Curated annotation (Swiss-Prot):
UniProt keyword annotation of Cytoplasm present: no
Stretches with biased composition (Pro residues): 60-85
Renumbered residue ranges of the record's region Disordered: 53-88, 618-662
Molecular function terms from GO: ubiquitin conjugating enzyme binding; ubiquitin protein ligase activity; zinc ion binding
Catalysed reaction, written as an equation: [E2 ubiquitin-conjugating enzyme]-S-ubiquitinyl-L-cysteine + [acceptor protein]-L-lysine = [E2 ubiquitin-conjugating enzyme]-L-cysteine + [acceptor protein]-N(6)-ubiquitinyl-L-lysine
Protein name: E3 ubiquitin-protein ligase RNF19B
Record remark on domains: The first IBR-type zinc finger is the most crucial for interaction with UBE2L3, UBE2L6 and UCKL1.
Zinc finger (IBR-type): 161-227
Cellular compartment(s): Cytoplasmic granule membrane; Endoplasmic reticulum membrane
Disulphide bonds in the chain: none
Broad enzyme group: transferase
Single GO biological process annotation from the record: ubiquitin-dependent protein catabolic process
Transmembrane annotation, as ranges: 330-350, 391-411
Length: 687
């Protein structure tokens, strides 16, 4: 029994040795075993389990089998080195702007973001932005702003850096409402005038400038004019003009004045493309946000106010439309608010639980939770929202309805009437009057449209018209007066008393005809014939020679040739029409003098008539006095003025006028050739 156990122990020991040798030969290619496996292997070895028995047992005489040779190791695998690119192209970085690969030192890193561009592209980009007065510089690839220190480091140009700093200063000062820049050319001096509204005269303190300008209109000081008058005087010089072959300048095209306006803060001119864009504009120079229609700095609620400005329209609402909208809002506000509240309450009571249930269900949908827990959470949320939704609806309606009513009946009417848009005025003890007419001042755009199609006719009667007035003094003459303060350049022709006082009122003629033909060197012209009836020595009428161009500065006036032919037909037996020479303009009219035995009495009573065309500078008549004289004259377009019996003679002069009338009637058959024809050939008017 003992021998059998010794043989079994030796056999197991030999097998274990062979197994360990095999592991040693195979372990060179495998990682070493973990310490736990080695410990288990040592514990399972039989000599360690039975140390005493192995020593006492004699060694067997049976030789152990030779160990098997280990397998040859696998040949080493050579890993080829990575191929090196020629010229070191791995160190080059591609610029995202010009797509050129450049070394890293030519592509700096921006401090505000991680985008990188080459120095050449960055300098060109900054140069373009600064030259166009855009100092809010950003990264070319994103909206991150560039710091001034980084801009200076990239530019390395003293002149461009100075311009950039000047534009930065101007942008900061433009936000100050009391900052005023000197209007003199090449003067960059600014005056910060606090509390100078009552004393608007400012003086530039720069040495060598000393320009005086106005605090309100920010232009050169106008001592004898208001800001509106000075603005109207400067308005024609702002428009771009084109020359007509006749020498008259008109606007370039229709609507060009509406496409170009100046910023209300920095006065930089801005052109708006007619592409259907909105009216909310942002100045790229100073960053001012303003409305293109009213040209005022606005907020986000401007287009919701009753100002009449629309977000997409091309012009603001008229006063009539604003008043109608206001009245309809006041009347329909209770109905509309009640309807909104009636719809909002059930919508909130039903919609809030549905919204809460869907949100809770969507949150638990992607999570591995039990079905019962999910249903419990959704049910609890819906029950709580059903309880809270009526309270939320009541609070919302209770707060929202009073706010809407206060806005409709309080804020809207006050803001509308404060801006003068409601047109409600109180008459002198006659109650409240609502004015629907637009009586605003004439803008540059309106004057520009009026310049496009100048005409001679009925449309020109709206401005200062030519007035042919007569007086009883025989020394009065025919003169031309040019209006300086009217919207359209017009001429006032004053006929002397030699026509009415010396000839017509003398009882030798019942009427005379004045035919005016004006030629402004245009393709078409209009001819008007008017008749003058004499009642008294101061009879006057109003005739328009034509609206030529709108009022502009005298130094910008051009020379236009106007040909006026005046045909004066009268019935006296004899009269003489003489002329006096002037410096530049001449008016000469002559009539043949025919003597007869029957007209000897008439010839003694008719005095010589002189008609003189004076220079425009020689007449300084007031516009109001000219209009006052012309208000008493009837319309000239009527054909009834051609009749000799247009105005009934007064009873006191009836007996005095009838004998000469019979005398002239007898002379018609004998002296038909005595009708005079006077022509004013060419009058050169300096406009």
């Amino acid at each position: 029994m003992r021998l059998r156990n010794d043989c079994l122990v030796r056999l197991l020991t030999s097998w274990f040795g062979i197994f360990c040798l095999y592991e040693m030969t195979e372990g060179s290619a495998e990682p070493p075993p973990c310490p736990g496996a080695r410990r288990r292997r040592l514990l399972l070895s039989l000599p360690n389990v039975f140390p005493g028995r192995t020593r006492a047992a004699p060694e067997p005489s049976v030789p152990s089998p030779p160990p098997s040779p280990p397998p040859p190791p696998p040949p080493p695998v050579s890993v080829p080195p990575p191929p090196s690119s020629p010229g070191g192209s791995e160190s080059l970085i591609e610029c995202p702007l010009c797509l050129v690969r450049q070394p890293p030192e030519e592509i700096p890193e921006l401090l505000s973001c991680r985008h990188r561009s080459c120095l050449r592209c960055l300098r060109q980009y900054l140069r373009i932005e600064i030259c166009e007065s855009r100092v809010n510089l950003r990264c070319p690839e994103c909206a991150e702003r560039l710091s001034p220190q980084h801009v200076r480091a990239i530019l390395r140009d003293p002149l461009l850096t100075r311009k950039y700093e000047e534009f930065l200063l101007r942008r900061c000062l433009a936000a100050d409402p009391d900052c005023r820049w000197c209007p003199a050319p090449d003067c960059g001096y600014a005056v910060i005038a606090y509390g100078c509204a009552s004393c608007p005269k400012l003086t530039c303190e720069r040495e060598g400038c000393r320009t005086e300008f106005c605090y309100h209109c920010k232009h050169v000081w106008h001592p004898n004019q208001t800001c509106d008058m000075a603005r109207q005087q400067r308005a024609p010089s702002l428009g771009v003009r084109r020359k007509h072959p006749s020498g008259i300048s008109y606007g370039q095209e229709s609507g060009s004045a509406d496409d170009m306006k100046s910023c209300p803060r920095c006065s930089a001119y801005i052109i708006k493309m007619n592409d259907g864009s909105c009216n909310h504009m942002t100045c790229s120079v100073c960053g001012c946000e303003f409305c293109w229609l009213c040209m005022k700095e606005i907020s986000d609620l401007h287009y919701l106010s009753p100002s009449g400005c629309t977000f997409w329209g091309k012009k603001p609402w008229s006063r009539k439309k604003k008043i109608i909208w206001q009245l309809s809002t006041l009347i329909g506000a209770p109905v509309g608010i009640s309807l909104i509240a009636g719809i909002a309450i059930p919508a909130m009571v039903i919609g809030i639980p549905v919204y809460v249930g869907r949100k809770i269900h969507g949150r638990f949908e992607n999570k591995k939770t039990s079905r019962h827990k999910k249903n419990l959470a959704v049910t609890g949320g819906v029950i709580l929202s059903v309880i809270a939704s009526p309270v939320v609806a009541a609070v919302s309606v209770g707060i929202g309805v009073p706010i809407m009513l206060a806005y409709v009946y309080g804020v809207v009417p006050v803001s509308l009437c404060r801006g003068g848009g409601c047109g409600v005025t109180t008459a002198n003890g006659k109650g409240v009057k609502i004015d629907f007419e637009e009586d605003g001042p004439i803008t540059v755009a309106d004057a520009w449209r009026a310049l496009k199609n100048p005409s001679i006719g009925e449309s020109s009667m709206e401005g200062l018209t030519s007035v042919l007035s007569t007086s009883g003094s025989p020394t009065d003459g025919l003169s031309v007066l040019q209006g300086n303060y009217s919207e359209t350049a017009s001429f006032a022709a004053l006929a002397g008393g030699t026509l009415t006082g010396g000839m017509l009122s003398g009882g030798r003629a019942k009427y005379c005809r004045l035919e005016v033909q004006a030629d402004v060197q245009k393709e078409t012209c209009q001819k008007d014939s008017v008749s003058l009836g004499a009642v008294s020595d101061s009879a006057s009428t109003r005739a328009m020679a034509g609206s030529i161009i709108s009022s502009y500065n005298p130094q910008e006036r051009e020379v236009n040739n106007m040909e006026i032919q005046v045909h004066i037909e009268a019935k006296p037996s004899r009269y003489q029409l003489m002329s006096e020479s002037s410096t530049e303009e001449s008016l000469h009219a002559s009539a043949p003098l025919v003597e007869s035995e029957d007209a000897e009495a008439c010839r003694n009573q008719v005095a010589a008539c002189d008609i003189t065309l004076a220079q425009p500078e020689s007449i300084r008549s007031d516009l109001e006095s000219s209009d006052a004289q012309s208000d008493d004259v009837p319309d000239l377009a009527s054909e009834e003025y051609d009749s000799p019996h247009l105005f009934p003679p007064s009873p006191s002069n009836a007996l005095q006028e009838s004998p000469p009338h019979r005398m002239c009637a007898q002379e018609e058959g004998l002296c038909a050739h005595e009708e005079s024809l006077s022509k004013v050939e060419i009058i050169e008017l300096r406009v």
